[in-house]
């Protein structure tokens, strides 16, 4: 679908997910205004190198708490992708920009009379509930338990939930068409040069800094599928509410087994840090809602392989001396 000339804003455009959203939007013919902390910072050069960026991408300095700057950037746009969010577990530095930032962006979108706002939330706003039946299927109707997140000092999930609630409340009050994406842990090759938080636990296994793996199960999704999910819900007139983005659940032991198969030269751990308790089981989830819009998820094995290749290419992970550089056939 090509939509030449349509103008959209992407907040936090230099981020892991946002960079792929910008890339996809440019490929589909959109004109993009991206907000970043500093438009001249070399760390945003990867955006300028994207196909179509020279003609249809401009970068703007707009802090999440600078309402006037947000209004100026969003004015004239047909839609907004609000992906910017602080990645920290420090409540003092995270909560205000996450919550008020969501409010300010939607306020600015309402003022500009945009067609739709697509908001990047998280599975952290969905599944953190100790009272949920372990056999129950997690879907878009589920919400995390705010008190549980606060009492366990899970400030990331706490902040994501407050920010999403703020977004819904503001959108309702202002009459803004809001659609929310709730991705799980995101993997896949980054476009930016800096390593992002979600790839750190992969890197620590490969470098040998982690001698064991945790008795932990997580659900994963590819960053390119997350980006496509954002664009699909923006373009589909019928899209509404929340959308979980998730491909498959893996125990950390399965993650290191997959990595060891693809990259046996690295000192990957072979033991679990918790050998007393039963192996952690994943929660059950459904992604039928986003699949109904046409999204087909990439296998996470492919995401893991391409994540590591990208870490090698960007210099975050040294190439083993005896590395076999032949391409690997990835079975789904």
From Swiss-Prot:
Role played: Cinnamoyl-CoA reductase probably involved in the formation of phenolic compounds associated with the hypersensitive response. Seems not to be involved in lignin biosynthesis.
Residues binding NADP(+), per UniProt: 12-18, 37, 43, 63-64, 83-85, 156, 160, 183-186, 198
Active-site residue list: 160 (proton donor)
Similarity remark: Belongs to the NAD(P)-dependent epimerase/dehydratase family. Dihydroflavonol-4-reductase subfamily.
Pathway(s) of this molecule: Aromatic compound metabolism; phenylpropanoid biosynthesis
Keywords: Disulfide bond, NADP, Oxidoreductase, Plant defense
S-S bridge residues: 149-157
GO biological process terms, semicolon-separated: circadian rhythm; defense response; negative regulation of circadian rhythm; phenylpropanoid biosynthetic process; response to cold
Major enzyme class: oxidoreductase
Species classification: Eukaryota, Viridiplantae, Streptophyta, Embryophyta, Tracheophyta
Tissue expression as described in the entry: Expressed at low levels in leaves, stems and flowers.
Name of this chain's protein: Cinnamoyl-CoA reductase 2
EC number annotated for this UniProt entry: 1.2.1.44
A Pfam family hit: Epimerase
Source species of the chain: Arabidopsis thaliana (Mouse-ear cress)
Xref: InterPro entries: Epimerase_deHydtase, NAD(P)-bd_dom_sf, NAD(P)_dehydrat-like
GO molecular function, one term: cinnamoyl-CoA reductase activity
Domain of life per record: Eukaryota
Protein's UniProt keywords contain Transferase: no
Gene3D superfamilies: NAD(P)-binding Rossmann-like Domain
Reaction catalyzed: (E)-cinnamaldehyde + NADP(+) + CoA = (E)-cinnamoyl-CoA + NADPH + H(+)
Induction summary: By the bacterial pathogen X.campestris.
């Amino acid at each position: 679908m090509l939509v030449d000339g349509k103008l959209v804003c992407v907040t936090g455009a230099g981020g892991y997910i946002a960079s792929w959203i910008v890339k996809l939007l440019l490929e589909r013919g959109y004109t993009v205004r991206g907000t970043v902390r500093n438009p001249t910072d070399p760390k945003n050069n990867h955006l300028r190198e994207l196909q179509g960026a020279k003609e249809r991408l401009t970068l703007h300095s707009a802090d999440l708490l600078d309402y006037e700057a947000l209004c100026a950037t969003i004015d004239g746009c047909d839609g907004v992708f609000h992906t910017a969010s602080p990645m920290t577990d420090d409540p003092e530095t995270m909560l205000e920009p996450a919550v008020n930032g969501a409010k300010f962006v939607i306020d600015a979108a309402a003022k500009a009379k945009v067609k739709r706002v697509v908001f990047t939330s998280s599975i952290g706003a969905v599944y953190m509930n100790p009272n949920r039946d372990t056999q129950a299927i997690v879907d878009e109707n589920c919400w995390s338990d705010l008190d549980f997140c606060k009492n366990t000092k899970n400030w990331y999930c706490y902040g994501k939930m407050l920010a999403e609630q703020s977004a819904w409340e503001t959108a309702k009050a202002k009459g803004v068409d809001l659609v929310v994406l709730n991705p799980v842990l995101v993997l896949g090759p980054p476009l930016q040069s800096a390593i992002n938080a979600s790839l750190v636990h992969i890197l620590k296994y490969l470098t040998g800094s982690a001698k064991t793996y945790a008795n932990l199960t997580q659900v994963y999704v590819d960053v390119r599928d997350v980006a496509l999910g954002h664009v699909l819900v923006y373009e589909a007139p019928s899209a509404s509410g929340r959308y979980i983005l998730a491909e498959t659940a893996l125990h950390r032991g399965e993650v290191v087994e997959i990595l060891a198969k693809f990259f046996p030269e690295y000192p990957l751990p072979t033991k679990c840090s918790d050998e007393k308790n039963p192996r952690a089981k994943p929660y059950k989830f459904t992604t039928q809602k986003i699949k109904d819009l046409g999204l087909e998820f990439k296998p996470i094995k492919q995401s893991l392989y391409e994540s590591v290749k990208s870490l090698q290419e960007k210099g975050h992970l040294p190439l083993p001396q005896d590395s076999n550089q032949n391409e690997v056939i990835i079975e789904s």
